[in-house]
Swiss-Prot record:
SUPFAM superfamilies, alphabetized: BPTI-like (SSF57362)
Protein name: Kunitz-type serine protease inhibitor homolog beta-bungarotoxin B1 chain
Annotated organism of origin: Bungarus candidus (Malayan krait)
Subcellular location: Secreted
Annotated ranges, domain BPTI/Kunitz inhibitor: 31-81
Major location category of this protein: secreted
Lineage of producing organism: Eukaryota, Metazoa, Chordata, Craniata, Vertebrata
Length: 85
């Protein structure tokens, strides 16, 4: 991984760590919605929260519309959707 990629990853992890602990706040309101691929032409890899498996999973997102249960990275998905006891 390039140094730029490592810096980005470190920044995302730091952001996640600085957020209020997930156990004391509500999960992102769209995390409980089913994944919606959207309807634009270009496909990119995104992540959604799977409520049944209680984890973030990759899926092909078409870049617009859909619902809010899509995140650019697995880390962002985990930060917004995982609730720890």
């Amino acid at each position: 991984m390039s140094s730029g990629g490592l810096l980005l990853l470190l920044g995302l992890l730091t952001l996640c760590a600085e957020l209020t602990p997930v156990s004391s706040r509500q999960r992102h309101r769209d995390c409980d919605k089913p994944p919606d691929k959207g309807n634009c032409g270009s496909v990119r890899r995104a992540f959604y929260y799977d409520t049944r498996l209680k984890t973030c999973k990759a899926f092909p997102y078409r870049g617009c519309n859909g619902n809010g249960n899509h995140f650019k990275t697995e880390t962002l998905c985990r930060c917004e959707c995982l609730v720890y006891p």
